């Protein structure tokens, strides 16, 4: 209840700020949508992720989550946001506060408030939680399924950003909140690993450059990060260590008549938490002198087509995948390859109302035990959007 009170207070403050603007040029936009998903999964998947396609959440062994699939109903995609635009001398202060109902982390599987954006910028500087420059949100296709292509870089992060070039062509450089995860593999549960804790002495550094074209754009991005861990166990053997993570991305949108082609290729080491659906950043590598942590190489790819049949009828279809180069200390059932594909038919009879049906397929392959599993995901969705602007002379 307290969270709802805070949310309501923020909205009301935004409205009040607009109403009190001296020159009438300040503006507040309230927007969002209500979305309902109804569908079925052919196979039993991780119940915390019952309404999305995530190859990493398919079972790693037979009957891990049960024998058969199930029907699902969900409103977790429902979204609400507030944007403000305030004159500040020769510049403009822009803020975005946006949330949805899709629980993750400790709230995985729940219908609860999840912060998407809490971000502000003025001129060439920005701060807050927003899209990482390493990702390209315009690669995301018009899917009904919430999670999206597993092979794209996708991460909202707390950051400080500098944008020396803005517009259709742009350059962004950011310092981002660091973080990572580890897979202890065959060494999981061993006493000598129990006292190891992560440490991040430096922020992640990311950058993007987009070149605007007449029929779309081409974008390149990169990221560098330091991942450290410390052994706090009072033993003669010190398992502390560190690795450097890095990643490169190339992406594009090409507009061809009534079509938009969305493409991305990502490769790096130790950047799995910047990917849309990938496992741990660090794995165990066994050597003649023992075992050490290594940054796991990852490659992701996305190829989707959005096609408009008419002004009211459209389709999105495509394929994506993630490949992990597993270390020799990871367990045989560790995640190795994930594939993702779907096609849909969307209909918008009037503005702000949309319905559609979608058929999706995903597949998981393990590291070395020969296990693989496929799942078919079918859903119908109904979406009602709203947007209202206050102020700005209106």
Describe the role of every protein-language-model region.
Residues 44-49, 106-112, 138-145, 183-197, ...:
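Outer-membrane beta-barrel translocator domains and adjoining extracellular loop/strand segments
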Residues 7-15:
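Bacterial N-terminal signal peptides
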Residues 1-4:
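Positively charged n-region of N-terminal signal peptides that target proteins for export
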Residues 347-349, 373-394:
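Outer-membrane beta-barrel "beta-signal"
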Residues 92-103, 177, 220-226, 314-327, ...:
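Transmembrane beta-strand segments that form the barrel wall of outer-membrane beta-barrel proteins
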Residues 213-335, 392:
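Detector for outer-membrane/organellar transmembrane beta-barrel domains
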Residues 71-75, 108-117, 151-155, 198-202, ...:
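Transmembrane beta-barrel outer-membrane domains
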Residues 22-50, 54-183, 199-217, 252-267, ...:
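Outer membrane beta-barrel
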